[in-house]
Amino acid sequence: MTALDLSSPVAVVGTGTMGQGIAQVALVAGHPVRLYDAVDGRAREAADAIGARLDRLVEKDRLTGAGRDAARARLVPAGTLGELADCALVVEAVVERLDVKQELFRALEDVVGDDCLLATNTSSLSVTAVGGALRVPGRFVGLHFFNPAPLLPLVEVVSGFATDPASATRAYETARAWGKTPVACADTPGFVVNRVARPFYAEAFAAYEARAADPATVDAVLRESGGFRMGAFELTDLIGQDVNESVTHSVWQSFFQDVRFTPSLAQRRLVESARLGRKSGRGWYDYGDGAERPGPHTAAPAGAPAYVVAEGDLGPAAELVALIREAGVEVRPEHGYGAGRLVLPGGGTLCLTDGELPVSKDLVHFDLALDYRAATRIALSASRGVRPGLLAEATGLFQALGKKVSVIGDVPGMIVARTVARIIDLAFDAVATGVATPEDVDTAMRLGVNYPLGPFAWSRRLGATWARDLLSHVHEWEPSGRCAPSLALHRHADAAEAREDTDS
């Protein structure tokens, strides 16, 4: 099954920001496009707005003047649904209400031809439920674009329970012909991106609720150590706290209140107080005129130790040994058993967090980094009874490497490590339940939410057992089940261990 021919008209119903964006994508690809909105005059206003954006593309040399004029000629506002009768594809982008969408598609089914592909851009509703209102649900598919649709490349092509594979393939190939990167996925709450991404927000909010760190510090650690483009607090302020919380609540409810997707009470209170983020002028941060954004907590300068003893294999943090040497600090290697560690001159131990709490007074944990060489900030954590001077020694060591240091509360798994481990876990669970392929999950998370690595690529870098082991330890300290490793992750780690036993 191939993509729609460019001569085939495409209709977009709903002319808000997303509807306009989808219409622009189809228009620039070369299709005749019909715009329809239930509110009189909105389709014409949307056509004018799209025309203005085409003008800006010409100004930026991304579209020729002739291309703009041809595109404008192909864009037609429709006054009634009947004017969409000859369309080969109708994409719906109306309000996220099941009854409204079902009513619309029932009406469309009475208008369009039998071979017309019907698609919903829903981000939170069941594609199966929306399509269940149709007499012929086989031609119904989800086409989930990401906002802004003309700029973001990802499109999730969602097959409902009754979607004909040929319909899904045609939608997939059409999205690709439009210059997008489609990923195929089954109809599951949150599809790929909004399902696998929940821990990015949840673990940040959990650290805040546990008083381990404030929003500015969590955001800085996620950006400067984790390699994420934005922290969870600033990102949800950009998305809109009401929108983000609604998606989380929808996924949680759709999974029958699965504890892994439990919403944040702190975020709920933010929404209830109308602190919705940038659009309301205040969310986690204040965006009012003259407001100063708080900076992250950063440790005061401390002296570097003269040497460290490196025992065993530091695993994902092994690069630190070379960095310490390059900083002029002597490294004394020693053979060790079990997890690697750095022993400081005062006798204290510095370890990469493994999901345990640093209960010993002689132990400091440091957080995971995407790339320890490139990281500009490292989080440290110790018990409240840590031996005096040990945190200063650990801080001085990382400062000698050119890193800012944020000391956070003693939460198991800290910030980056716990977030990455949970994302990896949900990715394995999604693949095991037939939602998407590992390759498509990685593509979706990189392109849909700008993660520096896909979950499976991250798992390969960190080791097959890393996420399972860390989450198992976190679960021992927090036995609610939210961080318990999935069966899929257990199987993956167990298989890797079995291969190692066979090879040894």
What does each model-found stretch correspond to?
Residues 26:
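Aromatic pocket-lining residues of Rossmann-like dinucleotide-binding sites
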Residues 15-16:
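Glycine-rich Rossmann-fold phosphate-binding loop(s) that bind the pyrophosphate
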Residues 31, 36-63:
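Glycine-rich phosphate-binding loop and adjoining beta1-alpha1-beta2 segment
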Residues 19-20:
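N-terminal Rossmann-fold NAD(P) dinucleotide-binding loop
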Residues 103-154, 159-173, 342-391:
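Rossmann-fold NAD(P)-binding glycine/threonine-rich loop
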Residues 2-4, 29-31, 180-183, 187, ...:
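NAD(P)-dependent Rossmann-like dehydrogenase/reductase catalytic/cofactor-binding core
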Residues 63-76, 138-139, 180, 361, ...:
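A short helix-to-beta-strand connector/capping loop
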Residues 42, 56-118, 125, 129, ...:
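Rossmann-like NAD(P)-binding element
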